[in-house]
Amino acid sequence: TPIKSSAASDVYKRQEYHYIGAKSQHVEDWYRYPSSMDVRDFYGGDLQGVLDKMDYLEQLGVEVIYFNPLFVSPSNHKYDSQDYDHVDPHCGKIVKDGGRLLEGWETDNTHADRYILRTTDSENLEASDRLLIRVIEEAHKRGIRVILDGVFNHCGSFNKWLDRERIYENKPGYEKGAYISEDSPYHDYFSFHDNNRFLYNPTYDGWWGHDTLPKPVSYTHLRAHETRRHL
């Protein structure tokens, strides 16, 4: 049965950004069948909702809460991380908001002002991190353990280390992504087949060949020490 979600959980708006051939959208009809490619469709739900239901979960006898990745990411499954350092404000807390949505014909995410503000602003990121900490603390008070999923053999094309979408390119406080510049501090995090293609080099390795899932260099690779340290 569809539940009434908090206002924060409904923040994914239609046309907030473009991903894998279409715009993000908030699903209004819970009874429709999922599409074959619904990774950018969102049904609501956030960490505040989990926090609000913590007593109920305890009464049910829940001993463990297992989360899909909660890192910043454009997909609903979030196995294509955009920022490993922070909780996605769409699941956490959006303190600072505004900016335009993409027009129906637009596919360039450098114009996705609202999405960029929501996912790169330090106030939003830090507030979301604090909310996760509170969820964990309240769970532990009730003897409930929390497991956070994560994937590190690939990230996402939105990831700030690569920044194929150029979301971070002109944002203060962020380094240039490896897609954008050969001089990026993250250049050696990825394998490029042609280093003569900069600026904006699309020749990086992708997991199973998917360009939306760039693959950091193998942990056994000589260049991987910095990637290992960061993770």
Residue spans of the language-model regions?
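Aromatic- and acidic-residue-enriched segments that line the glycan-binding/catalytic groove
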Residues: D10-Y19, S75-G92, F152-P202
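Short catalytic-loop micro-motif centered on adjacent basic/acidic residues
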Residues: I147-L148, R229
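Short, cationic motifs built from Arg/Lys/His that form the positively charged side of catalytic pockets
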Residues: I136, H225-E226
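A cross-domain feature marking catalytic cores of carbohydrate-active enzymes
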Residues: P69, L148-H154
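N-terminal structural segment of carbohydrate-active enzymes
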Residues: S6-R145, K160, G209-P216
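Formylglycine-dependent
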Residues: F192-Y219, R223
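Single conserved hydrophobic/aromatic residue that forms the stacking wall/gate
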Residues: T1-A8, Y12, H221, R228-L231
